[in-house]
Each structure stands twice: as C-alpha cells, then as structure tokens.
C-alpha cells in the first residue's frame, strides 16, 4: 500500500482527514478553482482539478477502510486473549495459517497481524489484497476478519443507510471512470467535488464511531 508509510504515525481517521484537507486545499488554491459560466468553456486545468479532487476523496475512503481495520485488529490483539477474539477472526486465522508453530508463545499476535496485513495489502505472490472500497468489498472484508459490518449502522440526518450505500457505490463508479478512462463525468463540478469531500468526511467519522462501539462490546 503506497500510503502506508505516510500514515503509519496517524490514526485511520487522521489519515483520511489529511487527504480530505488536501482536497480542500486543491480546490481553494488551484488556478481553475471556479466553475465556468454557462455557455463558456472551462478554463485550463478545470477537468484535471475535478478528476484529481474526486480521486483523492475516494483514496481517503479506501485508506481509511484499510487502516481502520488494522487499527482495530491491533487493539483486539493488545487487549484480548486468543480465546476472547471474535469467533469470525479465530475461524479465519485457523483457515489461513498453515504453520501451527507461528502461534507458539506470544508470537500469535504478530502472526495474526501479518495475516490481516496480507489480506489488506496482498501477499508476496500477489494473492488476496483489498482492491476497491465498494460496499460489497468493505462488508466482506470486515465480516471476514471481525464478524461485523460497520456500514450497516451508518446513517445521519437526511441520509438513510440506503442513501449512504448508494453514494459509496457512486463514488466508486465515478472514480473508476476517472482512473480507468481518464474522463470527467459530465455532471461533475467543483460543488460536486466539495460534496464528495464532505460525504467521505462524515462517512469515515460515523464508521469510526461504529468501530469504537464494536470494541466496547467485544
């Protein structure tokens, strides 16, 4: 994960917030940081600004999802004994690890963390890896490791859980168009990019709250 070295000293939420502040800075300081007037062509750099800002919003979400899982697993390993870990995690580790000696003494903690990092980043053979932070992939990752889907509890004022999921799917789709086709989705403007930054900021804060509650209930 290319961002891991940069976010090692930050919490998952701080890492996401830093990336979103980069989006804010980009929108405020870029020469093309005004929408074109109706009927007028966009100025130079307007399309790239929209694309880079939206891609950064998505990156903040993906980085958060990955780092928050590792952060939560680290907390569980530091605070619980093996038999107290979530059943889903114990089942998954038993299936993934082929070396019983890796769990001798206290080395089980580092072995579990290694397995989880492989699941997120991919291993040396290019297997596993968390590719896209879609609703389905996030749910699958967290259910597999923790036996818990934080997304199911996320909603806020005037934003139902279904609407949250729809917006995540749309962000993934828009980011896919930008990254894989190099195109700017037609309806995207500066307000839209700011909207994505606000959405991801709220989403990661709510997700983090769900993980805090999960820790308290384990």
Regions found by a protein language model. Name each.
Residues 43-59, 168, 186, 190-193:
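Short, charged/polar micro-motifs that form catalytic or ligand-binding hotspots
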Residues 1-55, 67-70, 78-79, 83-88:
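Charged alpha-helical initiation segments
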